[in-house]
């Protein structure tokens, strides 16, 4: 247990830091600090349809980033999803517009993200609350364009 706590402590920080901007990394920053997640990117219809279906275990600071070509209304469900998930619905500038916590595995009830969503970050259920992630926090990733609140190469203010 102690090694996991040490690793977690190194990955989540309240101090400003240079975020690593890579396709397989997402940094989430807010008043609580910041956390970097290793992610798989789902940026086409087939990958988005598959999502995290049939995944039975996911390391703590890992997730999936769903990327859309343009802002739109999105809705998710948990069909064939085996683990609880938190969903962060994100605007084109990287601002978290909605957080849905602890989506129920296998539940077919639609989970609406709202309008103007460009990306969705799925992480382990309950992790948003444990870290303090809320609406208004900001994501940093290379997929955000010139309108990004926190462009790649910029310091995150945790």
Question: Can you annotate each of these PLM segments?
Answer:
Residues 20-158:
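Compact, glycine-rich, soluble single-domain proteins
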């Amino acid at each position: 247990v102690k090694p996991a706590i040490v690793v977690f402590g190194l990955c989540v920080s309240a101090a400003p830091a240079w975020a690593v901007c890579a396709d397989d990394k997402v940094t989430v920053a807010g008043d609580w600090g910041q956390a970097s997640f290793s992610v798989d990117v789902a940026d086409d219809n087939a990958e988005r349809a598959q999502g995290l279906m049939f995944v039975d275990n996911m390391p703590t600071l890992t997730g999936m980033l769903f990327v859309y070509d343009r802002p739109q209304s999105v809705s998710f469900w948990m069909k064939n999803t085996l683990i609880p998930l938190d969903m962060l619905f994100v605007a084109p500038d990287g601002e978290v517009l909605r957080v849905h916590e602890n989506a129920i595995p296998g539940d077919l009830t639609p989970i609406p993200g709202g309008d103007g969503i460009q990306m969705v970050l799925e992480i382990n259920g309950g992790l948003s609350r444990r870290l303090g992630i809320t609406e208004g926090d900001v994501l940093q990733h290379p997929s955000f364009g010139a309108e990004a609140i926190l462009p790649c190469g910029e310091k995150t203010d945790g």
